[in-house]
A protein has these predicted regions:
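Positively charged n-region of N-terminal signal peptides that target proteins for export
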Residues: 1-4
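Bacterial N-terminal signal peptides
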Residues: 7-16
Length: 467
């Protein structure tokens, strides 16, 4: 009799536990999600039953994956994704069933940074974006989707966010990050592949806020670092909730908050990228970033503190130390009125040119604008050579401006600039400098770039000196 009662009680408890078992997943694994194509995509969640077996079934191939939860109910596995397409469903069960619907397969890009990455198509107070209205009312593809991670500042890493996936349409597009959307739009137009944007950015944020505590340990004794009270707060509160979500690559638009720290930034930036790649465990995935646009940060120029040209230089030099990277140059779209360039379409397109050429193998064009390579001194002239000129250099009939030249006294004077015969090099001189030793181009807070390659991509600001 006791055995019978015990058996009934045990069965009742088992049924109760099964009924109460609830499987949950981070918000990024939700309806409308977009998974990276042709890979082993990470997927994870929780169940409230320790050691419980969890089964994942994917509708595109009817395959079942089984994984056991650990002692805290956490589980994680990988699922094979096909060539792009959809919509599909993913079914997850541990006794209770959870369905993720309207799943697309395509290309996933992480988009991070500060306000110029965050700025959405409807703009912000005082800043209206060029072409935003046209972009919003023009029929958008539902194959372009974004997952916006809400603002969250934390002292320790979080597991989840309250973000949701959204398809691009006239109702949702105003809240899409503008530069990232124009990137996705161009990729979709050229390749015909669905594109998902995992967006995590906060206006005014420093690079320190996006770095893990561990990655910053080598720099903690730096006097500038000690002044930063925002270290890791956005890495913990936002980025950590999507780390491990399988991506194709990353887009980064940040730096304005660090213009006074170019030397430190040049160390932190490659360190951050290396750390993110380590945490994602996807090797050296593509990392493309925007060089900050010119703006009148200080109205003083060189010699009155570290103007933004030094930060642009730090970003340019990072190309040499960050593997599989590229830089979208923006020297022609800055503003003396606002730190937020109104032309986000070219920002997105220039990100796309990098991805199309360097990641997706599209041939026939140079992916970015001219970058200073070397110089030679011939009498009272300096001849400047560049990478990424494509066929030739040009100035859109404005004339070459904002070149400077200096002699051994290290005093820079406005320089006359001209092309060599083939229009592949720039020759600078000044009647004020008989024996030149150094040259600069657009090395100020605010300029309107005048030097381009023949594809219309602008040259980065630069200096040949290290004074």
């Amino acid at each position: 009799m006791n055995k019978k009662i015990f058996s009934v009680l045990a069965a009742t408890l088992l049924l109760a536990n099964t009924a109460n078992a609830k499987i949950t997943m981070p918000a990024i694994f939700g309806d409308g999600m977009l998974l990276q194509q042709q890979t082993e995509a990470n997927i994870w969640g929780k169940t409230d039953t320790m050691g419980k077996k969890v089964t994942i079934t994917t509708s595109w191939n009817k395959k079942k994956y089984t994984v056991s939860a650990d002692n805290e109910g956490n589980w994680k596995t990988q699922i094979s994704t096909p060539h792009y397409g959809g919509p599909y469903e993913i079914t997850i069960s541990d006794g209770e069933t959870l369905k993720i619907k309207n799943v697309e397969i395509g290309e996933v890009w992480l988009c991070a940074g500060q306000s110029n990455m965050e700025m959405c198509l409807w703009g912000r107070r005082g800043d209206v974006l060029e072409g935003a209205m046209d972009a919003i009312v023009t029929k958008a593809s539902p194959e372009i989707r974004t997952f916006n991670v809400p603002h969250n500042m934390k002292s320790a890493p979080v597991y989840d966010s309250k973000g949701v996936w959204q398809e691009a349409n006239t109702e949702t597009l105003p809240t899409f990050p503008a530069g990232a959307y124009f990137f996705a739009k161009k990729i979709h137009e050229v390749l015909g592949i669905p594109v998902g944007l995992v967006h995590t950015s906060v206006g005014g944020s420093s690079i320190q806020a996006w770095m893990s505590k561990e990655s910053m340990l080598p720099f903690m004794e730096d006097s500038i670092m000690k002044k930063h009270g925002d270290k890791s707060i956005l890495f913990n509160g936002m980025l950590s909730s999507v780390i491990g979500y399988t991506i194709k690559g990353a887009l980064w638009y940040q730096g304005e908050a660090n213009i006074e720290e170019p030397d430190l930034y040049q160390k932190l930036f490659p360190t951050m990228v290396a750390d993110w790649r380590k945490l994602w465990n996807q090797g050296d995935f593509p990392f493309y970033y925007a060089q900050i646009a010119p703006f009148n940060y200080h109205k003083g120029g060189v010699g009155k503190g570290k103007n933004s040209a030094y930060l642009r230089e730090a970003q340019m030099k990072s190309l040499d130390v960050i593997p599989n990277s590229g830089m979208a140059i923006l020297t022609d779209i800055g503003s003396d009125r606002t730190i937020h360039p109104q032309n986000k379409e070219d920002v997105g397109k220039r990100f796309a040119y990098l991805a199309l050429g360097k990641t997706y193998g599209v041939k026939g064009f140079t992916t970015t604008g001219p970058i200073y390579k070397s110089m030679s001194i011939n009498g009272n002239e300096i001849e400047l050579s560049f990478d990424n000129i494509d066929q030739c250099l040009l100035d859109w009939h404005t004339g070459l401006k904002d070149f400077e030249i200096a002699g051994e006294d290290k005093i820079f004077h406005p320089a006359k600039a001209k092309y060599n015969k083939e229009k592949t090099k720039i020759i600078v001189s000044s009647p004020e400098v008989e024996k030149p030793v150094a040259a600069r181009y657009a090395f100020k807070d605010y300029v309107q770039g005048t030097l381009f390659n023949n594809l219309g991509l602008p040259a980065s600001s630069f200096r040949t000196d290290n004074w």
